[in-house]
């Protein structure tokens, strides 16, 4: 099958199109013919050898999330799964390919009427956004700051916070991303490349700051957002687009009673992890969640997809199409 290999850590050019053996399902596995591959920012870090979760052994076919059709199953798996439209995590690798073997227990059916590409777009980002919104306990009337608001997770967080009746401040960089945040319905839009962006947030909130921060950037942006968090507010660390987590060790957190929350608290058990995926698919099928698929690339152009994400040129979700 066609696949994309990572033979050595490096820039986007380290992703090399090639061939891989056709996968054969082992016991408890299913083979999926891939129609869409979810590409995440973390995968660009993995490719560069800077994974926050530990680097894989090379060579490897990257990719941790796919959507497609089950074409075969191994021993112990219901034959009725063959032909089903599904999304699935892959166990950390193997997704950048035409076919991939996955654990049958990780396969989640795609609701009737929902496009597989849309389903793939919410596999990771929808699961994460719903989990983070629930974790933060976003309530009607609260001010919510979403960093990286035009990204895959951020654009969904904006939608979910608005659905809860919150007043949303969307922070992003550049006119295209700010325009998208406005289209999504954000009440206030700020460009955090402006030196006065925090002043704009304080002005919008009457000087009180925000009740909830979804910190998808980290670094200096996250540190500034932490200072904007109101007394008793919630600071949710949801990503590190800057390459580093926000330093939350300062005394101001305790002094102002800010609650620190993070990704590790979202789905602590496999059952909860799966439940969030099902909820994300249901929300997408009903139209309550509308992922922004900003760009798609052919499988063999995975390097271009990574380059777009790293250049901050990507809007919403990026998919590979085999």
Regions found by a protein language model. Name each.
Residues 1, 271-322:
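C-terminal hydrophobic helical "lid"/dimerization subdomain
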Residues 45, 79, 87-150:
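NAD(P)H dinucleotide-binding glycine-rich loop of Rossmann-like/cofactor-binding domains
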Residues 81, 120-194:
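Mid-domain Rossmann-like dinucleotide-binding core that forms the NAD(H)/NADP(H) cofactor-binding site
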Residues 196-207:
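Short amphipathic alpha-helix with an adjacent loop that forms part of the alpha/beta core around
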Residues 220-288, 322:
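Glycine-rich phosphate-binding loop and adjacent beta-alpha segment
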